């Protein structure tokens, strides 16, 4: 994606999330899981419940869905993410994406990651103490999560502006599927050349057929069913 892209979002693709959430709370008409490989618009999950704004009032990010609830991922020391164990058996941290109402086993390797997710999205206070996880005053060896969680990727292993930085994305933060670029506006070009005509009504495909230039996961501002991409990719 490029700065100035105006991207249409199908808000009914995974069930229509009702807005404003300050009136209804979280409600969704119809529910459909997000498939792997689709480009998705979602609200910024980095602050979780610590952000006093309602979820639908937060910044809008886009990324492609790399992993779904129940998947296991291997993350090496360089931040590369794999859906299968690397063949060279390099040291990796293994994390499982939580499913709604399913228990996840906690280990010294993964509890820091889950501790952050519990504090942000599960409405509980958690802390790692002496290689053990303490949740709401009790030491636990597993935890039952109340949301489905997704891994959103920037499509570039060197750019960590994705779930490697802000963590798993809960289902409550999902807005919809990116369907096409309505138009693209280059604000740095002369006035007569600002419209990137070749990008007008460009269809957004799955990750294996459509990748952003430079791979940066852009953020934007939600207006109706469109996202205005504001970040410039290298």
Locations of the language-model features?
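Extended hydrophobic leader/signal-anchor segments used for secretion and membrane insertion
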Residues: 1-234
């Amino acid at each position: 994606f490029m700065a100035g892209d105006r991207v249409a979002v199908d808000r009914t693709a995974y069930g229509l999330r009702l807005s404003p959430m300050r009136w209804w709370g979280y409600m969704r008409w119809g529910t459909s899981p997000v498939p792997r490989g689709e480009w998705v618009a979602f609200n910024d999950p980095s602050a979780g419940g610590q952000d006093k704004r309602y979820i639908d009032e937060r910044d809008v990010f886009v990324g492609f869905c790399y992993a779904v609830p129940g998947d296991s991922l291997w993350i090496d020391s360089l931040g590369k993410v794999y859906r299968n164990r690397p063949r060279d058996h390099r040291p990796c941290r293994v994390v499982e994406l939580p499913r709604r109402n399913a228990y996840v086993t906690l280990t010294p390797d993964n509890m820091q990651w889950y501790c952050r997710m519990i504090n942000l999205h599960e409405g509980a206070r958690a802390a790692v103490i002496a290689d053990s996880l303490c949740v709401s005053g009790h030491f636990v060896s597993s935890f039952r999560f109340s949301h489905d969680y997704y891994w959103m990727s920037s499509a570039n292993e060197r750019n960590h502006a994705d779930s490697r930085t802000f963590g798993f994305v809960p289902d409550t933060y999902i807005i919809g599927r990116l369907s096409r670029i309505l138009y693209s506006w280059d604000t740095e070009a002369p006035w007569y050349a600002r419209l990137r005509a070749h990008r007008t009504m460009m269809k957004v495909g799955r990750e294996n057929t459509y990748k952003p230039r430079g791979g940066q996961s852009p953020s934007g501002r939600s207006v109706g069913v469109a996202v205005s991409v504001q970040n410039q990719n290298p």
